[in-house]
Amino acid sequence: MARSIKKGPFVDNHLMKKVEAQEGNQKKTVIKTWSRRSTIFPNFIGITFAVYDGRKHVPVYVTEDMVGHKLGEFAPTRTFKGHAVDDKKTRR
């Protein structure tokens, strides 16, 4: 179920303050965040976020296509190693 339109998109206040502080700077630094639930706004374009995936911070460079999505969508939490190989096939 999608979020109600009357509520509007969600962004953590501490993350929004960091983005607004960086808008005036010429030098763009990486913003480290644990807020995977925050929605990407148009003023986030061109900023690199380090989104926490439970183990490390994954760098996510925000582009135009990402607006409206959540930051956590671009930092996968699970790594798929592949299915177990059947030893019977390799022995023949």
Swiss-Prot record:
Give the family this protein belongs to, as stated in its UniProt record.
Belongs to the universal ribosomal protein uS19 family.
Keywords tagged on the record: Ribonucleoprotein, Ribosomal protein, RNA-binding, rRNA-binding
| Gene Ontology terms, MF aspect | rRNA binding; structural constituent of ribosome
**Keyword rRNA-binding attributed:** yes
Please give the PANTHER family that the UniProt record associates with this protein: RIBOSOMAL PROTEIN S19P FAMILY MEMBER (PTHR11880), SMALL RIBOSOMAL SUBUNIT PROTEIN US19M (PTHR11880:SF8)
**GO BP terms in the entry:** ribosomal small subunit assembly; translation
Query: Its biological function?
Result: Protein S19 forms a complex with S13 that binds strongly to the 16S ribosomal RNA.
Q: What is this protein called?
A: Small ribosomal subunit protein uS19
Q: Which GO terms describe its cellular component?
A: cytoplasm; small ribosomal subunit
